[in-house]
UniProtKB/Swiss-Prot annotation:
Record's bilayer topology term: Multi-pass membrane protein
Record-level GO cellular component terms: chloroplast thylakoid membrane
Subunit structure: The 4 large subunits of the cytochrome b6-f complex are cytochrome b6, subunit IV (17 kDa polypeptide, petD), cytochrome f and the Rieske protein, while the 4 small subunits are petG, petL, petM and petN. The complex functions as a dimer.
Transmembrane stretches, start-end: 36-56, 95-115, 131-151
Keywords annotated in UniProt: Chloroplast, Electron transport, Membrane, Photosynthesis, Plastid, Thylakoid, Transmembrane, Transmembrane helix, Transport
Gene field: petD
Organism: Phaeodactylum tricornutum (strain CCAP 1055/1)
Major place of residence: plastid
SUPFAM superfamilies xref list: a domain/subunit of cytochrome bc1 complex (Ubiquinol-cytochrome c reductase)
Protein name in the entry: Cytochrome b6-f complex subunit 4
Highest taxon of the lineage: Eukaryota
An example Gene Ontology molecular-function term: oxidoreductase activity
Amino acid sequence: MSVIKKPDLTDPKLRAKLAKGMGHNYYGEPAWPNDLLYVFPLTMLGTLTCIVGLSVLAPTQLGEPADPFNTPLEILPEWYFFPTFNLLRVLPNKLLGVLAMAAVPLGLITVPFIENVNKFQNPFRRPLASLTFIFGFFTAVWLGIGACVPIDKAISLGFW
């Protein structure tokens, strides 16, 4: 059984409609009333039900109240900002840190122009793009781990 209704091309009435260029309007399920009046509201109602159900069954836990006179020794950003936080923390000049962060997207923009190959080619046969990805991934992981250690061990991660 199929979800898609296939037209019967042996039907002479359908062949006449197709010859006039109007067959696509006369078979299958119409999109206008069904999608906009049934599928979309049902999806929104399901999403709203999930959100309300989760907020009722698993409310957020409140932490301890903030104390303005007792600040932590080191304030860390969210985990996805760890690499940029460590880059700004390790580089001696803040302008150099900002330029290093701006160089990342600029360097990624140049990769397709440097490696001029077919876009449908196997990614394992694109050595520059693969090496750029691997180098960037491991650098981001290294900088992210380094943000969690003290600044004197941020570069070496305590290995040397």
